[in-house]
A protein has these predicted regions:
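Acidic donor-binding segment of Leloir-type glycosyltransferases
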Residues: 1-34
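Short, flexible, basic/aromatic active-site loop/helix in glycosyltransferases
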Residues: 83-84, 89, 101-128, 132, ...
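Short aromatic/hydrophobic "clamp" motif used to bind/position activated sugar donors
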Residues: 52
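Conserved donor NDP-sugar-binding/catalytic core segment of glycosyltransferases
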Residues: 63-104
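Glycine-rich, basic loop-to-helix element that forms the pyrophosphate-binding segment
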Residues: 31-47, 68, 133
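Membrane-embedded multi-pass helical conduit in multi-pass membrane proteins
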Residues: 222-299
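Conserved nucleotide-sugar donor-binding
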Residues: 48-49, 131-145
Length: 320
C-alpha cells in the first residue's frame, strides 16, 4: 500500500502460532489481557509515524484509503480525519440487514455517516461522525491531549475526539475515505453490540455531561414512553392518546426509512420487515442500556489486566 511506512498489528489475546508476515513493514505485537483502548494505545506508542491510521480486524480498507486522508494533514490544525465503515458487500443477508439499520438516518440519526458515505465533499465532523475502524490521528496532537482513555469502551474514540475538539483542533469527515466493515448478524449478536455502544455512551456522558446528544435522549424517551402507555391508559386517557399518536408517527417514519435503506443498500425489499424490526429493537436496546448504565451508582472500567492510563507509557509487548 503506497504511502504506508509501517503496519503495527496489536493482538490483545494470547496467540500460540503467530501469522506469517510477508511484508517487512508489518510488525505483530501480542499483549494479552489489555483492553481494546489499551491495545490501541500500545499501537500508538509502538509506531513511529506522525499520522497514525486505525482500522479493525473485521474491516477491509479501500485501495485509496490512505491517499484520501493523508494530504489533509498538510493543514497543521487538522488533527483527525476519518470516513465511513460501509457494510462489506460479501456479508450475509442478516448482516446486511444490520448494516441497513445502521445506515438509515432514522436508525442512527447523525451517526449514520459512520456507516454510509454522506455528502460529496470534505466537511467538519463531530465525535458522533467517526469511528476507530476508519480514523487517522496526528501523533503530536495525541501527545498534547493524551491517548485513548482505557476506562471507556466502546466510545473511546468519541471521548478522544471530544478532548481534541475542546483544544480547538479540526476534525474532518471524508466521504470517499472508505473501509468495508463486516456487520454482526441480527438479532442477538447485533443487539449485544448496540447495548455495548449505549453503555460506552453512558460512561462518556458521565464524564462529559455536555456530550449527551438529543438522539440519545430520543431513544431513552421511546423506552419511557412505551413503559408509560399501559399506565396512562388506565389513568389518563388524554395523555395515552397523545403518546399513542407519537408512537404511530414513529412507526410510520421508521417503516418508510427501512424501505428506503433497503433500496439504497441494494438489499432485496423482502428483507424490509427485518430491517424495520432491527431499527425498532436497536432504538429500544440502546435507550434501555443507556438508562440502566447511567442509573448505576458507579461505572467500573471495562479494561482488564495491568493499569494503563492513556497518558502514560504502555507495558512492553511480547513480540513473537
Amino acid at each position: 500500500m503506497e504511502g504506508v511506512g509501517e503496519i503495527v498489528i496489536v493482538s490483545n489475546i494470547a496467540i500460540t502460532k503467530p501469522p506469517t508476515l510477508r511484508d517487512s513493514r508489518v510488525r505483530f505485537l501480542v499483549a494479552p489481557n489489555l483492553s481494546i483502548s489499551e491495545a490501541r494505545n500500545l499501537g500508538i506508542a509502538s509506531s513511529t509515524g506522525e499520522v497514525i491510521a486505525f482500522t479493525d480486524d473485521d474491516c477491509v480498507v479501500d485501495g485509496h484509503w490512505v491517499s484520501s486522508a493523508i494530504p489533509l494533514f498538510e493543514d497543521p490544525n487538522v488533527a483527525v480525519v476519518g470516513g465511513p465503515g460501509i457494510t462489506h458487500p460479501t456479508d450475509t443477508p442478516l448482516c446486511k440487514c444490520a448494516g441497513a439499520a445502521l445506515e438509515s438516518i432514522a436508525g442512527t440519526y447523525s451517526s449514520s455517516s459512520r456507516y454510509a458515505s454522506r455528502g460529496s465533499g470534505i466537511r467538519e465532523a463531530g465525535e458522533q461522525n467517526l469511528s476507530t475502524c476508519n480514523i487517522f490521528l496526528r501523533r503530536s496532537t495525541l501527545q498534547t491531549v493524551g491517548y485513548f482513555d482505557r476506562t471507556i469502551y466502546p466510545c473511546e474514540e468519541n471521548e478522544l475526539i471530544w478532548r481534541i475538539k475542546a483544544r480547538g483542533y479540526r476534525v474532518l469527515y471524508v466521504p470517499n475515505c472508505i473501509v468495508f466493515h463486516h456487520r454482526r448478524p441480527i438479532i442477538r449478536p447485533f443487539l449485544s453490540q448496540i447495548s455495548s455502544y449505549a453503555k460506552g455512551r453512558a460512561t462518556l456522558t458521565r464524564k462529559y455531561p455536555r456530550s449527551l446528544r438529543l438522539t440519545t435522549v430520543a431513544s431513552c424517551m421511546l423506552v419511557l414512553m412505551i413503559l408509560a402507555l399501559p399506565f396512562t391508559y388506565l389513568t389518563t386517557k388524554t395523555i395515552f392518546y397523545i403518546l399513542a399518536t407519537v408512537m404511530v408517527a414513529y412507526l410510520a417514519i421508521t417503516f418508510s426509512a427501512s424501505l428506503r435503506s433497503c433500496i439504497t443498500g441494494r438489499l432485496s425489499p423482502r428483507y424490509q420487515p427485518l430491517v424495520w424490526l432491527t431499527i425498532l429493537l436497536m432504538h429500544l436496546c440502546y435507550g434501555g442500556a443507556f438508562l440502566v448504565t447511567l442509573a448505576r451508582n458507579s461505572i467500573r472500567p471495562r479494561g482488564i489486566g495491568p493499569t494503563f492510563p492513556f497518558s502514560n507509557n504502555p507495558p512492553a509487548p511480547a513480540t513473537p
